[in-house]
UniProtKB/Swiss-Prot annotation:
CDD domains: DLC-like_DYNLL1_DYNLL2
The protein's name: Dynein light chain 2, cytoplasmic
Oligomer and partners: Homodimer. The cytoplasmic dynein 1 complex consists of two catalytic heavy chains (HCs) and a number of non-catalytic subunits which present intermediate chains (ICs), light intermediate chains (LICs) and light chains (LCs); the composition seems to vary in respect to the IC, LIC and LC composition. The heavy chain homodimer serves as a scaffold for the probable homodimeric assembly of the respective non-catalytic subunits. Dynein ICs and LICs bind directly to the HC dimer and the LCs assemble on the IC dimer. Interacts with DYNC1I1. Interacts with BMF.
Keywords: Cytoplasm, Cytoskeleton, Dynein, Microtubule, Motor protein, Transport
Chief place where the protein resides: cytoplasm
GO molecular function: dynein intermediate chain binding; identical protein binding; protein-containing complex binding; scaffold protein binding
Organism of provenance: Homo sapiens
Site (Interaction with myosin V motor complex) residue list: 41
Length: 89
């Protein structure tokens, strides 16, 4: 298992979906090294599991201001990397 600690900073999402997001991000980071590829993996998995349209941003330094559907937003850290995942559209 990964040694990356998950720290949820902000979430408007069910506990189960939050855990799915962390698990999915962990899998992505084990498979890929490039942030764009990690984001693509998470987005595609959530599109499959929870229906489109999900958006995912992965990185160490970014700001954001987004509109999301109710109960479909999470912002968390996995180790040193921030992950923003939300559904809109």
């Amino acid at each position: 298992m990964s040694d990356r600690k998950a720290v949820i900073k902000n979430a408007d999402m069910s506990e189960d979906m939050q855990q799915d997001a962390v698990d999915c991000a962990t899998q992505a980071m084990e498979k890929y090294n490039i942030e764009k590829d990690i984001a693509a993996y998470i987005k595609k998995e959530f599109d499959k599991k929870y229906n489109p349209t999900w958006h995912c941003i992965v990185g160490r330094n970014f700001g954001s201001y987004v509109t999301h559907e109710t109960k479909h937003f999470i912002y968390f850290y996995l180790g040193q990397v921030a992950i923003l995942l939300f559904k809109s559209g």
